[in-house]
Structures are given as structure tokens and as C-alpha cells.
């Protein structure tokens, strides 16, 4: 490898909008994220359950058919 051509890899702090912070390695000076594992619905269990029917189900519901 050539010397002095590679970016400096350092430990940085990742900051989420929810206030959670953690450390990781990066070539950037700081990292800001909008969502992390602390506030993501998949990890928190606060997922919304959506019942989605197909087009046929929508038609049946609209016209009162079985």
C-alpha cells in the first residue's frame, strides 16, 4: 500500500435524533442519523399492523358481497 494516500480511519460518535449515541469507526469526523436501533419500530416492537386486502377484497367490501 502507498503511504499517505488513504483517508484517516478513526473512532467517531454516531448521533441519532432520538438522543442515542454510539461509537463506530469511520473516515468522517461525525455521523448524524435520523433513526437508529434504539428508536426504529422494528427493534422497539412498536410496529403498526396494517391489514391490506387485495383488489377483489376491496370490491367485495364496497358492494357487500361475500
Swiss-Prot record:
Binds 1 zinc ion per subunit. GO terms for biological process: translation. Its cofactor is Zn(2+). Gene3D superfamilies: Ribosomal protein L31. GO terms for molecular function: metal ion binding; rRNA binding; structural constituent of ribosome. Keywords: Metal-binding, Ribonucleoprotein, Ribosomal protein, RNA-binding, rRNA-binding, Zinc. It comes from the Bacteria. GO terms for cellular component: ribonucleoprotein complex; ribosome. It holds the Pfam family Ribosomal_L31. InterPro entries: Ribosomal_bL28/bL31-like_sf, Ribosomal_bL31, Ribosomal_bL31_A, Ribosomal_bL31_sf. Zn(2+) binds at residues 16, 18, 36, 39. HAMAP family: Ribosomal_bL31_1. Binds the 23S rRNA. Belongs to the bacterial ribosomal protein bL31 family. Type A subfamily. Part of the 50S ribosomal subunit. This is Large ribosomal subunit protein bL31. It comes from Desulforamulus reducens (strain ATCC BAA-1160 / DSM 100696 / MI-1).
Amino acid at each position: 500500500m502507498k503511504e499517505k494516500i488513504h483517508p484517516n480511519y478513526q473512532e467517531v460518535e454516531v448521533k441519532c435524533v432520538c438522543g442515542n449515541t454510539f461509537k463506530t469507526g469511520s473516515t468522517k469526523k461525525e455521523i448524524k442519523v435520523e433513526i437508529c436501533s434504539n428508536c426504529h419500530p422494528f427493534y422497539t416492537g412498536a410496529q403498526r399492523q396494517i391489514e391490506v386486502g387485495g383488489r377483489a377484497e376491496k370490491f367485495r367490501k364496497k358492494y357487500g358481497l361475500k
